[in-house]
């Protein structure tokens, strides 16, 4: 038998918390919440369940998760986002796992995660197909999230298995939320990864993304929400190159201005 610390990230999560927290409470021997500055009723809802969030200014997802894990007193951690809702089969499977012998620390477990966009189960959401199977339960002495600014993953484990059941990932509940995340993801990507500053490459990448993530994936069969996920993939693919190009132009103009000012001052 072994204990599990649940690590949960929140930010303006009032819409989903009443669905997210109760299943996790059935599993948790300890509950760590890291909030990145919610301005809605997120903190109040957490406190109504007897939970006290820790504040950490948001940098990127993996760093937030590792911060939550660092506050865990148990070696085994279940790391979840505040828009991921466990079903009862997953809860029962984890409780059964806890009652057994403690696994080796190089072991990890994956969840079956179904993505919901605008309330509908989708086939794809760039850059993953739905469902996907991220590692969510692992030993913190062996594994941790990597430092990728977007699309981070757990690293360090040697073996993994799937947990029965599934998780509902209730993401992008509105177009406003989708555009906010699209802007945030692409900005962080350009800030922390090297993207070739090319409008031509951006256009080609966007066209390829449209064919792959809208036509070939079958998203076109899903009507309105399929158009949304196809647009998201297309816009994401173009924006990362456009922002890299714009950032590069600003740097070039700044250098040219400094050189011009220096020449005039001589």
Predicted segments with their positions:
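Acidic helix N-cap motif at the loop->helix transition within catalytic regions
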Residues: 18, 40-49, 89
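Conserved donor nucleotide-binding strand/loop of the catalytic core
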Residues: 29, 43-71
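Cell-envelope/extracellular polymer assembly enzymes that use nucleotide-activated donors
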Residues: 3-5, 30
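A conserved acidic beta->alpha catalytic loop
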Residues: 23, 27, 35-44, 81
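Alpha/beta-hydrolase active-site loop signature
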Residues: 38, 59-60, 84
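Catalytic metal- and UDP-sugar-binding loop of GT-A-like glycosyltransferases, i.e.
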Residues: 56, 80-82
């Amino acid at each position: 038998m072994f204990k599990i610390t649940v690590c949960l990230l929140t930010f303006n999560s009032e819409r989903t918390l009443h669905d997210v927290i109760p299943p996790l409470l059935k599993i948790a021997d300890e509950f760590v919440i890291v909030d990145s500055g919610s301005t809605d009723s997120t903190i109040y809802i957490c406190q109504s369940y007897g939970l006290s969030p820790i504040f950490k200014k948001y940098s990127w997802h993996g760093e937030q998760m590792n911060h939550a894990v660092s506050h865990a007193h148990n070696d085994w951690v279940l790391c979840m986002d505040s828009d991921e809702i466990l079903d009862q089969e997953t809860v029962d499977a984890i409780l059964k796992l806890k009652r057994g012998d403690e696994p080796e620390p190089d072991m990890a477990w994956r969840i079956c995660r179904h993505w919901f966009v605008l309330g509908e189960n989708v086939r794809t959401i760039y850059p993953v197909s739905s469902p996907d199977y991220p590692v969510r339960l692992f030993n913190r002495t062996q594994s941790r999230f990597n430092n990728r600014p977007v699309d981070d993953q757990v690293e360090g484990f040697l073996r993994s298995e799937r947990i029965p059941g599934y998780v509902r990932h209730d993401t992008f509940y509105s177009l406003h939320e989708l555009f906010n995340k699209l802007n945030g993801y692409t900005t962080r990507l350009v800030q922390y990864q090297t993207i070739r500053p090319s409008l031509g490459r951006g256009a080609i990448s966007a066209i390829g993304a449209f064919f792959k993530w809208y036509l070939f994936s079958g998203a076109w069969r899903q009507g309105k929400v399929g158009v949304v996920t196809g647009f998201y993939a297309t816009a994401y693919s173009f924006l990362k190159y456009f922002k890299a190009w714009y950032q590069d132009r600003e740097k070039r103009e700044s250098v040219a201005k400094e050189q011009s000012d220096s020449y005039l001052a001589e």
